[in-house]
Amino acid sequence: MTQRPDCYYCSKHQTGEDPPPGGWLVADEDWLVGHGPAHMSLPGTLRIESRRHFTDFADMTDAEAASVGVLLARLYRAVRPVTGAERIHLLATMDFQPHFHAWLYPRAADEPRRGTAFLDQGFECTDAAAEAAAAAIRSQLAPATREGRG
């Protein structure tokens, strides 16, 4: 697996430092998924991180591209009932950390801002709220595994 010693994500995956609130929700061959850091997340915000070092969708292997689609579907199904989100926004820029990672931001129906205005507002929640959301999302993900849906 390709890793770069100067990369924040590669380093944290190797050392186990800076774990997500509530721990990893998904840890498979290609992906790690955890709740986003509380200081930049709404409760239920998830961050998907590639285990292999690459920058964007164009750099994915065919297997990674296929698996991320299945993973996203599972995550959307788990986040929506926990957060009550009307929409879940997917954001992946890699501008600050050039290692593939994507954010899932749940947007409530009563949130007046839409699209990029919603994403531009900045988010923050407590560590306790992030950990509680992670636990609830973990319980939503568990039945999908038992039923063979992912």
Task: Give the label of every model feature segment.
Residues M1-G150:
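HIT superfamily nucleotide-processing domains
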